[in-house]
Design a protein with these regions (language model features):
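Aromatic-lined substrate-binding rim segments of carbohydrate-active enzymes
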Residues: 49-128, 163, 168-178, 254-269
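A short alpha-helix capping/helix-coil boundary motif
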Residues: 32-33, 67-70, 74-77, 89, ...
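Acidic/histidine-rich helix-loop elements
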Residues: 27-53, 69-88, 247-250, 294-297
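Acidic active-site catalytic centers that drive phospho-/nucleotidyl reactions
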Residues: 25, 111, 241
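Bacterial N-terminal signal peptides
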Residues: 1-2
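N-terminal carbohydrate-binding accessory modules
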Residues: 6-64, 308-312
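Extracellular glycoside hydrolase catalytic/binding regions
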Residues: 15-16, 40, 45, 107, ...
Length: 313
């Protein structure tokens, strides 16, 4: 007797790897992923649901999504919900986005969305994620979003040596479980100084990439020159977050500068994600408060940045 299964299988994606400065799939094709980052899970948890992921994939054309797991944010409205105070909430948020990305056949960045150094917590988090999704080709690990001031009062940044030591520890924890997955490493000064990493890269591991973030209203040709230098030294770059406005998330969208960045990324086969799926009163939030948590989002639910991003994707 013949039985037919009615279970729908999730679309499959090819496993990715790094060759030289580019991301490639199992077929040997160069891959440049384009997509959207969800905002901080602790600030906009309402968008962390499977329907929202399906909407940005199927309606907006996102090839990759990013779960931004807020680590140490101390906003009065969510102080009890950051990862350090409620790790289960952070894991749940990440897994919701990962599971939905798998279901919709796209890639997903699991982003440790921190500015400070939290090695023990990061190892615990990525050990959990790697164990849960071992062998799943959709998952990419972003182990430190934007290293910034370790001393805000005196404006002292984390050095590349400190970031490198942290990264080697977290990479080792992931590699103990997941041998080949792509891992993206943060770089100094809000993931801008990729040239520092290029001068002293992490060795002993394959499939590593390095983070470059830009906000086109603030960051111009001088930052692309840092990227060019890093690639000339053999680093593979991943723009895991970017925006068309000023670095503080405000100001008008500088479309000319944003297009210059997009052309540069496409010329160099660099994957990129736009920031962010959120509804805050700021330029970099794509949505208005009228937007439904699960989507779909009509044109009248989009801020100008959201309309720009949707057109780009």
């Amino acid at each position: 007797m013949f039985f037919m299964s009615c279970t729908r299988q999730a679309p499959q994606v090819e496993r990715l790897h790094v060759e030289g400065t580019v991301l490639m799939n199992e077929s040997g094709d160069t891959v440049e992923l384009k997509g959207m980052s969800f905002g901080w899970n602790v600030l906009w948890p309402r968008f962390y649901n499977a329907d929202a992921v399906a909407h940005v994939v199927n309606d907006w054309g996102s090839e990759i999504v990013r779960a931004a797991v807020g680590v140490e944010i101390d906003d009065d409205e969510c102080v009890v919900k950051n990862y350090l105070t409620d790790p289960d909430f952070g894991k749940q948020s990440a897994c919701t986005i990962v599971d939905a990305a798998i279901e919709n056949g796209v890639y997903v960045l699991v982003d440790w969305h921190a500015h400070g150094l939290h090695t023990e917590a990061a190892v615990e988090f990525f050990t959990y994620i790697a164990s849960r999704y071992k062998g799943v080709p959709n998952v990419i690990y972003e182990i430190w979003n934007e290293p910034s001031y370790k001393d805000h009062v005196n404006q002292i940044d984390y050095t590349w040596a400190e970031i490198k030591e942290y990264s080697e520890t977290v990479i080792a924890a992931i590699r103990a479980i997941e041998k080949d997955a792509v891992i993206v490493v943060g770089t100094p000064r809000w993931s801008q100084n990729v040239d520092d990493a290029a001068n002293d890269p992490i060795i002993g591991y394959d499939n590593l990439m390095y983070t470059l973030h830009f906000y086109a209203g603030t960051h111009k040709e001088w930052l692309r020159e840092k990227g060019d230098y890093a690639m000339s030294k053999g680093l593979a770059l991943f723009v895991t977050e970017c925006g068309g406005m000023n670095a503080d998330g405000q100001g008008p969208v500088d479309e000319e500068s944003t297009q210059a960045w997009i052309e540069w990324m496409e010329d160099n086969d660099i994957s990129y994600l736009f920031w962010s799926i959120s509804d805050k009163e700021e330029t970099c939030s794509m949505l208005l408060p009228s937007a439904r948590s699960e989507g779909p989002w009509a044109e009248e639910d989009l801020r100008p940045w959201g309309k720009f991003v949707k057109e780009q994707l």
